[in-house]
C-alpha cells in the first residue's frame, strides 16, 4: 500500500513511455537499489587534458571512469551472456571505416522518409556483428540548412513516433530526425519474453508492505532480468546510454553535420548530457527539456511531481461540480482515489482474463497525467469506470501503453 498516491507510480513508471523492448533498462532503473550520485554524474572527471574532438563514435573508458564504473546502472552484470539472438554481418571493410564509408539510403514512408542503418553491436569491436537502427526523417520545407535530432526519453521511447507528431513549424529549414535507440522499437530490440512475462513484472507490488512482499518484488524482478537475458543474449550488454550516445555521434557524422543540433526530453536530457560529455567539441544547439535528476533522488522527485500533477487534476475535477463523480474537493478526489488503490492492493480487479493491480492502476493514471489538462476528461472517465462501474479496462489499457505491453 502506498502512503502517497504516486509512491507506487515512481517505482512502476520511472520515465516517459518505455516500450516493451526497453523494459530491461526500465527495470534496472526502477527496481534496483539507488546508485550513488557519483555514478550518474555527467561531469568529466578532472584530467590533464580532455580531447574535445575524438574520432567519430569513440569512447575512452579511462577518460570517463565514472560513467563506466562497476556500479553504473548501465553496467549491471546479470548473468553470463548467451548468444541466442542472431545479428547481421558487419558491412564490408575493416574496423570503424567499414561504417564511416556508408551513406544513409532514405525511402518514402507516408509523408516522411525512413531508413535502416547498421551499427556495430559493440563499438569497441567494429569488426564484430552489427545491429540495425531505424530512423525517420521529416525533411525541411526547402533546402535544409541543418539537421535536428530528437529523442523523447523513456529510456526507450520511439524517436520515430516523436517525428511523426513533432511540430516542426519552428524549424522549417531543418531536417528533423528521430530514431529508435538500439534495443528498442523497430531497431534491433531487446526481447524479454511473451506478454505473460511482462505481466508478471508489472503486476508486482511496487510498494511492498512487509518483508514477504519485498522479497517477492526482488524475486520477480530477478526472474524478469533472467528472461531478458535468455531471450536477448549479448544485446543486453550493449544497450547503455554510452552506446546510444556513440550511435548518435555516428548519425551526426552520416548526415554531414560538424556539430550536433539536438532536442532531448526527459531521459533524452541525460542522453544529451552524456553526448556533451563525450564530445564537447561537437555540441551545436542543444535543448534539454524536463531534465532528469542525475542524483540518486530521481524516484523521490518523480513521485513528488506525479503527486503534484494529480493534485492539479483533482482540483480541476472538483471544480466541475456535479460533472465530477469523484468528489467535491481536491481532498475528496484524492481520498477516493487512494482508497480505490488500497482496495486493489488487497483485491485486484478482474479485467478480461487479467488483473488490474494497484501498481498497474497507478501506472495507468500516470499516463494521463503526462498529457496535462487535455487528458483530464479521459482520466475522469477511466477512474469513474473503474471505481463506480467496476470496469478497469481503460486504466489497464493506459498502463499497457505506458509499459509498452503488446497485445496477447
What residue ranges belong to the model's regions?
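Sec-dependent N-terminal signal peptides
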Residues: 1-4
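A generic alpha-helix propensity feature with a strong bias for hydrophobic helices
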Residues: 7, 21-22, 36, 40, ...
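Intrinsically disordered and other compositionally biased segments
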Residues: 13-16, 36, 44, 53, ...
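N-terminal low-complexity, Pro/Thr/Ser-rich intrinsically disordered segments
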Residues: 28-106
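Alpha/beta-hydrolase fold active-site neighborhood
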Residues: 64, 70-78, 334-408
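Gly/Pro-rich cap/lid or specificity-loop segments adjacent to the active site
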Residues: 74-360
Amino acid at each position: 500500500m502506498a502512503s502517497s498516491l504516486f509512491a507506487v507510480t515512481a517505482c512502476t513508471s520511472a520515465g516517459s513511455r518505455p516500450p516493451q523492448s526497453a523494459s530491461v533498462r526500465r527495470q534496472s532503473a526502477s527496481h534496483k537499489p539507488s546508485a550513488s550520485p557519483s555514478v550518474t554524474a555527467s561531469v568529466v572527471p578532472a584530467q590533464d587534458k580532455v580531447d574535445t574532438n575524438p574520432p567519430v563514435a569513440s569512447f575512452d573508458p579511462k577518460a570517463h571512469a565514472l560513467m563506466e564504473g562497476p556500479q553504473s546502472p548501465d553496467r549491471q552484470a546479470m548473468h553470463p551472456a548467451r548468444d541466442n539472438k542472431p545479428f547481421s554481418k558487419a558491412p564490408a571493410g575493416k574496423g570503424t571505416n567499414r561504417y564511416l564509408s556508408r551513406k544513409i539510403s532514405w525511402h518514402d514512408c507516408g509523408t516522411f522518409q525512413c531508413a535502416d542503418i547498421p551499427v556495430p553491436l559493440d563499438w569497441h569491436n567494429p569488426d564484430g556483428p552489427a545491429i540495425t537502427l531505424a530512423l525517420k526523417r521529416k525533411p525541411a520545407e526547402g533546402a535544409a540548412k541543418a539537421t535536428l535530432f530528437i529523442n523523447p526519453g523513456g529510456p526507450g521511447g520511439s524517436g520515430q513516433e516523436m517525428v511523426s507528431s513533432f511540430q516542426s513549424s519552428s524549424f522549417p529549414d531543418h531536417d528533423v530526425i528521430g530514431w529508435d535507440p538500439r534495443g528498442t522499437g523497430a531497431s534491433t530490440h531487446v526481447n524479454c519474453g511473451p506478454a505473460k512475462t511482462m505481466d508478471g513484472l508489472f503486476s508486482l507490488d511496487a510498494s511492498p508492505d512487509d518483508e514477504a512482499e519485498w522479497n517477492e518484488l526482488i524475486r520477480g524482478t530477478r526472474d524478469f532480468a533472467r528472461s531478458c537475458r535468455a531471450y536477448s543474449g549479448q544485446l543486453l550488454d550493449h544497450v547503455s546510454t554510452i552506446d546510444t550516445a556513440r550511435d548518435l555521434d555516428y548519425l551526426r557524422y552520416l548526415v554531414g553535420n560538424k556539430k550536433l543540433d539536438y532536442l532531448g526530453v526527459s531521459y533524452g536530457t541525460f542522453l544529451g548530457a552524456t553526448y556533451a560529455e563525450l564530445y564537447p567539441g561537437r555540441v551545436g544547439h542543444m535543448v534539454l527539456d524536463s531534465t532528469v535528476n542525475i542524483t540518486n533522488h530521481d524516484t523521490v522527485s518523480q513521485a513528488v511531481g506525479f503527486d503534484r500533477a494529480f493534485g492539479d487534476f483533482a482540483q480541476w475535477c472538483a471544480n466541475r461540480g456535479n460533472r465530477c463523480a469523484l468528489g467535491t474537493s481536491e481532498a475528496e478526489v484524492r481520498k477516493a482515489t487512494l482508497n480505490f488503490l488500497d482496495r486493489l492492493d488487497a483485491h485486484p480487479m478482474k479485467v478480461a482474463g487479467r488483473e488490474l493491480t494497484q501498481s498497474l492502476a497507478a501506472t495507468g493514471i500516470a499516463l494521463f497525467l503526462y498529457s496535462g489538462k487535455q487528458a483530464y476528461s479521459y482520466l475522469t472517465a477511466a477512474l469513474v469506470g473503474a471505481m463506480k462501474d467496476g470496469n478497469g479496462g481503460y486504466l489497464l489499457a493506459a498502463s499497457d501503453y505506458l509499459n509498452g505491453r503488446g497485445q496477447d
